[in-house]
Amino acid sequence: MSQQIKLLVGLANPGPEYAKTRHNAGAWVVEELARVHNVTLKNEPKFFGLTGRIMVHGEDLRLLIPTTFMNLSGKAVAALAKFYQIKPEEIMVAHDELDLPPGIGKFKKGGGHGGHNGLKDIISKQGNNKEFYRLRLGIGHPGHKDKVAGYVLGKAPAKEQECIEAVVDESVRSLDILLKDGLPKAQNRLHTFKAE
């Protein structure tokens, strides 16, 4: 059974100084999907982000990279979702995930924010509705919680970056399966992938 996702959000901090930091991994999925579909993301002030629209299996899929800072991502998601009447369960949010190693990606529906400020704000701005989908992109963990802020805002070493980019590419392919054949099949594909 196909899965109706109408909005894919890639979480990021704005500005060139953050573009290649681990915290922006979610945005790389949206950028890659736009590139594959030959779509240019445009700045939309009313949606507080970069937006685009693609067709996947005959259905509209809106793309959004908030240009607010990470902890205000919910403002952009809420504005676009309200305008296009998109329900929380029709949204997928791609984000960096400390609890997975680089090169691993996982799809998930619902759940908490796991300390991720972008997810926290989206949940809050959706009236505490947590039922949106997540695409969790592993970036690894620095080993101690006091090091997390510097770690997520830092750039990954070349080998780790290659692994993250490989799972971004695989996520785009798996997302196509999710939209056509549903979540379990997409999970089967993505969850068995490991970039080395």
Curated annotation (Swiss-Prot):
It comes from the Bacteria. It catalyses: an N-acyl-L-alpha-aminoacyl-tRNA + H2O = an N-acyl-L-amino acid + a tRNA + H(+). It is found in: Cytoplasm. Disulfide bonds: none annotated. The active site is at H23 (proton acceptor). It is an enzyme of class 3 (hydrolase). InterPro entries: Pept_tRNA_hydro, Pept_tRNA_hydro_CS, Pept_tRNA_hydro_sf. Signal peptide: none annotated. GO terms for molecular function: peptidyl-tRNA hydrolase activity; tRNA binding. TRNA binds at Y18, F69, N71, N117. The record marks D96 as: Stabilizes the basic form of H active site to accept a proton. The keyword Hydrolase applies. Keywords: Cytoplasm, Hydrolase, RNA-binding, tRNA-binding. Its EC number is 3.1.1.29. GO terms for cellular component: cytoplasm. The keyword tRNA-binding applies. Belongs to the PTH family. Monomer. Hydrolyzes ribosome-free peptidyl-tRNAs (with 1 or more amino acids incorporated), which drop off the ribosome during protein synthesis, or as a result of ribosome stalling. This is Peptidyl-tRNA hydrolase. It comes from Vibrio atlanticus (strain LGP32) (Vibrio splendidus (strain Mel32)). The lineage of its organism: Bacteria, Pseudomonadati, Pseudomonadota, Gammaproteobacteria, Vibrionales.
